[in-house]
Amino acid sequence: MSFVEDLSFGREGEVIVRNLLESSGNFDYVIDCSNDKYFQEKDIDLLALATDGHIAKYEVKTDRMAHETGNIAFEIRTSGNIGCLAKTEADFVMYYIEGNGKLYCFNAEQMRRYLRANRFKIYRMGDNAEGYILSINRLLRDKQMKRIRV
């Protein structure tokens, strides 16, 4: 898949999450900042102003394999750069799975602590990347993420 196709694919999850946040009633407005260089460097796709005045930062990942494998990959390095989970300054990561339309949410800092504390095996992955591969069921069972109804 080309870079442009990857961007288009990732956009699908961003649109779904933005629509979900906007319709939730919890936010006054949601800003798509995925094309802004400043926020790209921080791996933040959406800013949501909560009705209480708090600003929540979201990173959105769209996955095309998890519906077949039942796993989520957390890249810690990709092509010599720091991977998304290690890099993101988002409060939450929304993980959209194409193929079954499921959406999961986890607190980025809490997930980093969980991965470090459990010393999971680090795998070599495609695109010169390495990271953790964990079962969605395990993450749900361990209360590290939750499923969001779309």
Cite the ranges covered by each PLM segment.
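Extreme N-terminal tail/first-helix region
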Residues: M1-G13, V17
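Catalytic cores of nucleic-acid endonucleases
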Residues: V4-L7, D28-C33, K61-L103, A108
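A broad structural signal for short, well-ordered beta-strand segments within beta-sheet-rich domains
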Residues: S23-F27, H54, D142
